[in-house]
Amino acid sequence: MAEQKLFFDDIKEGDTGPEFSHELDRTDLVKYAGASGDFNPMHTNEVAAQESGLPSVFGHGMFTAGILSKALTDFVGVGNLREYKVRFTKQTWPGETLTTKVTVQKKYEEHGEHRVDLECSVVNESGEAKISGVAIAALPTRG
């Protein structure tokens, strides 16, 4: 499938990117631990998590940030992100459905590029924010 190109000319402030949803499960936690090398038992060992006072194992923050990164690059195109900053606001739990949100906040020109400021987040099915962030992308023009 060919990448659909987003042009600076075609978007306006307030536009939203396509949402991406993923139901977090324990397999995600184990796979991500292996891929990242983060074997903190709070992510994969139910007994260790409960002994530390948690109700269960919880998701890696960077896994959730990765879901948001994918949503951003799917929206603005690979190679167009100039900045991406996130704040981890809540833990993610197996069984939650995580959904990305991306909104265009501002359009402008800077450093010879046509840029957009984006507000982005990942929320669960109750609308509770798990990550909030901002990103800047440079987009091509039609002209």
Could you say what each language-model-derived stretch is?
Residues 1-15, 93-143:
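HotDog/MaoC-like acyl-thioester-processing domains
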Residues 21, 83-85, 132-136:
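Well-ordered beta-strand positions in beta-sheet-rich domains
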